[in-house]
Structure formats: structure tokens, C-alpha cells
Design a protein with these regions (language model features):
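Bacterial N-terminal signal peptides that target proteins for export
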Residues: 2-15
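Acidic/histidine-rich, surface-exposed loop or edge segments in extracytoplasmic proteins
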Residues: 34-55, 150-153, 168
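An active-site-proximal "capping" alpha-helix that borders the catalytic cofactor pocket
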Residues: 158-177
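Auxiliary, metal-adjacent structural segments of Zn-dependent hydrolase domains
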Residues: 56-122, 130-135
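Second-shell loop/turn segments in exported
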Residues: 49-57, 91-94, 127-136, 148-161
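Active-site recognition of the HExxH zinc-binding catalytic motif
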Residues: 139-152, 166, 170
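Pan-zinc metallopeptidase signature
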Residues: 33-41, 206-301
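C-terminal segment of classical bacterial N-terminal signal peptides
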Residues: 19-27
């Protein structure tokens, strides 16, 4: 479960065109793999008229088709369903078994809330509207996919599963590599970063007592955990998170160990279920080409 988190003169690439051009090779290779299950997608029409625009946008952007592509390298023993749905006013995304079928639901309310909170322009920290959109969307989807992975493969999880799903999502985004991973990670952290920035100068942050009983970490904890794993994975690419004070040096010192432990867990428990060659093909797709490419214009404020 996930709680919500320049314009170029030559915008040559929309997400819809990206999917249309990139889907063919991985799909063909996937048919040759030994996996039995596939990823099924569905866009439910919203009952709430105020969500019709969001529905139209995600359909035009082929948002779920993109998710099917980025997760195609997993050998699934059964079908996994990813649905965009109306959630009765609640901005959310979650995994559960619907009639015993593993299902990820991404609420139109959540997608609408992400769009509404995007920065109007590139932030002082260099986060573009596209990065904030793509990073948050992919992080949320990968978080829920992490829950699906734990369930479908019956993987043991020590500690809170929500923390494990966050770590899975962070690791997944890092696999895009280098500058692409940097852009996705800072985009994913945008919602948490915005919250932390608004409260960082306060001597105390007041939270309702119930926040400490939640199966989710607080926004501050989730932000620091995310950037710590990223910094631990590549201290050079993510050096700015320490230089700018986003990650305290006291925590930064142990991040390489946190990432190392996470990588070992992923390689031991998850990697045996992944078609590595297909994964390399998917991760090599130029998700951010050209460098100034953005999400479709109608997704941005």
C-alpha cells in the first residue's frame, strides 16, 4: 500500500509512443521463456465523473502497458492482474488476492493526487515534473509488485513487509542504472522530500500516536530509507543527497552495508525467478530519451 507521495521546444517522445515502439522485442522473448503466468491488465471505467479525465489520461499514456513491460522478465507461475480502478474516493494502491487471483489495484484517485502535487516546473533541487511523475508512479507500482512477488513465490520476509516492499521498489528502480536511476529515484522521493523539506527546520514534528502503530513507516523514515539505499548502491551518482544534507552523514556511513544486505537478499530470493537476459533488454530501453522527454503533456499541470 502506498500513501501519496521544462517544457522543451522539441517534445518528441510520449509515453504512448515509447510503449508502442519498445513492447515488441520483450514480448516476443517472453513467449519463449518457461514461465506459465502472464501479466493481465485492465482499466475499469470510473464511476466517479471527476476521475474521467484521469482515466482518459492513463489510457492514452498506456500506463499499465508500461508496467507490464517493465515487469515482463519475471517468470510467473500464475497470472498477475494489474488494474486501474475507482476506489471510492481513497487515493491508494494495493496488492491482494481477488478471488484467489494475485491482483494489484492502482486507484484513479491516487493517480489524480500524484498529478495534482507535481511541481509546476523544475525544482531548485533539479527534479523535473516528468521525473516526479515517472518516479512516483514506477516506485508505487514496484512497491505493490514487491508485495505480489513475496506472495506469488512465497518468499520469507523478516520485519515489516511494507519496509521490504519499499526496499524492493528502490532496488528495482536502481536497476535502470546511472543517470536514469538517479532521475527515477529522485522522482520517487519527491513526495517524501516535499514533506521533509516543509518540516526539516521545525525543532519537533508532531505525529498522531496512531502513526507509530502503522504497518507503514512515517514519511520521514521512508524518505531516508529510500535515499540511503540509493546512496549505498552508488555513492558517486547519489553524492548530492549527502552534500545537500538530505541524508545525515551519520546514516550515510552505514548505507553501503544496508544496500549490500538488500542486494544479497534480492539475488538469493528473487533473482532465481527472473529472466536475466530479458531483464537486461527491458532495462536498456531508453525511458528518458531524449534527455528532456516528458510524460504526455496532458499529464502535467
Amino acid at each position: 500500500m502506498r500513501t501519496p507521495l521544462r517544457k522543451s521546444s522539441t517534445i518528441a517522445l510520449s509515453l504512448a509512443a515509447l510503449i508502442a515502439g519498445a513492447l515488441t522485442l520483450p514480448a516476443a522473448q517472453a513467449e519463449e521463456s518457461e514461465k506459465k503466468g502472464t501479466i493481465q491488465i485492465e482499466y475499469e471505467k470510473p464511476k466517479d465523473a471527476s476521475l474521467q479525465q484521469t482515466y482518459d489520461m492513463v489510457r492514452a499514456a498506456n500506463a499499465l502497458e508500461m508496467l507490464r513491460l517493465v515487469f515482463v522478465s519475471f517468470r510467473l507461475p500464475e497470472d498477475l492482474y494489474i488494474k486501474a480502478v475507482n476506489c471510492d474516493g481513497i487515493p491508494n494502491a494495493y496488492f491482494f488476492r481477488e478471488n484467489d487471483k494475485p491482483t494489484i489495484r492502482i486507484c484513479y484517485e491516487y493517480l489524480k493526487s500524484v498529478r495534482e502535487m507535481l511541481p509546476k516546473e523544475t525544482t531548485p533541487e533539479g527534479i523535473t515534473p516528468r521525473e516526479a511523475l515517472m518516479g512516483q508512479f514506477l516506485f508505487t507500482a514496484a512497491h505493490e509488485f514487491g508485495h505480489a512477488v513475496f506472495d506469488i513465490y512465497n518468499l520469507p520476509v523478516l520485519g515489516r513487509q511494507e519496509d521490504a516492499a519499499d526496499e524492493f521498489a528502490t532496488y528495482f528502480l536502481l536497476q535502470f542504472g546511472g543517470e536514469r536511476a538517479h532521475r527515477l529515484i529522485r522522482g520517487a522521493a519527491y513526495a517524501y522530500y516535499d514533506y521533509v523539506q516543509k518540516n526539516k527546520d521545525k525543532p519537533k514534528v508532531t505525529l498522531p500516536i496512531a502513526a507509530f502503530s502503522s504497518d507503514h513507516g512515517t514519511p520521514e523514515q521512508r524518505f531516508y530509507n529510500l535515499v540511503c539505499i540509493a546512496y549505498g548502491a552508488d555513492p558517486k551518482v547519489f553524492a548530492i543527497v549527502v552534500e545537500k544534507g538530505f541524508l545525515p552523514e551519520t546514516r550515510a556511513k552505514v548505507c553501503k552495508y544496508e544496500y549490500s544486505n538488500l542486494k544479497y537478499a534480492i539475488k538469493t530470493l528473487v533473482s532465481p525467478h527472473v529472466d536475466e537476459k530479458l531483464a537486461e533488454t527491458v532495462m536498456a530501453i531508453s525511458w528518458f530519451t531524449p534527455p528532456d522527454a516528458r510524460a504526455p503533456d496532458n499529464w502535467l499541470p
